[in-house]
A protein has these predicted regions:
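Metalloprotease/metallohydrolase-associated module, dominated by Zn2+-dependent proteases
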Residues: 140-187
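Charged, low-complexity, helix-prone segments enriched in Lys/Glu/Asp/Gln
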Residues: 16, 45, 120-125, 151-154, ...
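Long, well-structured alpha-helical subdomains associated
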Residues: 163, 181-223
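Extracytoplasmic/secreted envelope proteins and their assembly/folding machinery
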Residues: 31, 35-42, 89-90, 99, ...
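Post-HEXXH active-site segment of zinc metalloproteases
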Residues: 9, 118-148, 189-192
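Peri-catalytic and regulatory segments of divalent metal-dependent proteins
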Residues: 3-126, 180-181, 201-203
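Residue-level signal for pocket-adjacent positions within structured domains
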Residues: 88, 157, 198
Length: 223
């Protein structure tokens, strides 16, 4: 178990963008919902992590990123010792309309760690750089700076190549975590449908909202 803390390290991760929605909670209600979600989600996520990935550090720390002017965002990262960190910006805590929403986002971020997405994403970046950098050489890009530029592009494409898959994996496992902690994942997943739908852009990093909803519905129906 853990207590919400404060983190001030910047992260270069995609932000969730808010949309206008009714029934915004008071600050007091939002903070209370966050604390309840931490108390119930963290033990479930830790237990599942230890069952599925016994070699991983499963001691989740859930923190508040209170730096000013932050967007609505939540992210999962690792501290220097490999401890999994789940961070919420203050605007995200305020944006969630109920306990199910804040809990589902928390479960989704915990799922990224349990599924090993950081390591897998890094591996994809390396593979993408090698493939596209190699192709540039084969196809006649003999200038070294051109090949280096192609390699950088390849790393970016490789890092994104499974990001949609990772998000759907996190939605699926997050659904199980949220439900096991006593929350309604279908109600919680509504948070994602107040943000712009990315559709099916080639280099988009998040799946279409319809795909995400179908994933949550499918997993929830089997619980």
């Amino acid at each position: 178990a853990c207590t919400p803390a404060i983190v001030d390290q910047p992260r270069d991760l995609p932000a969730l963008q808010p949309t206008v929605a009714p029934q915004q909670l008071s600050q007091r209600q939002a903070i209370e919902n966050f604390k309840i979600a931490v108390a119930r989600i963290e033990p479930v996520a830790e237990q599942l992590c230890r069952q599925r990935s016994p070699s991983q550090n499963c001691d989740f720390q859930i923190v508040v990123d209170d730096r000013p002017n932050q967007p609505v965002n939540a992210y999962q990262t690792l501290d220097p010792n490999g401890r999994p960190i789940i961070a919420f910006t203050v605007p995200l805590i305020a944006e969630a309309r109920n306990r199910d929403e804040i809990a589902f986002v928390m479960a989704h971020e915990a799922a990224h760690h349990i599924e090993g997405h950081i390591a897998r994403q890094q591996n994809n970046a390396v593979v993408g750089a090698l493939l596209i950098g190699g192709l540039a050489g084969v196809l006649g890009a003999t200038d070294q700076s051109t090949i280096e530029a192609a390699t950088r592009i390849g790393a970016g494409v490789g890092a994104r190549s499974y990001s949609k898959e990772f998000e759907l994996e996190a939605d699926a496992l997050g659904t199980r975590i949220a439900a096991s902690a006593g929350f309604d994942p279908l109600n919680g997943a509504q948070f994602f449908f107040r943000i712009p739908d990315p559709g099916d852009r080639f280099l988009g990093t998040h799946p279409a909202n319809g795909d995400r909803l179908r994933t949550v519905q499918r997993v929830a129906a089997g619980l």
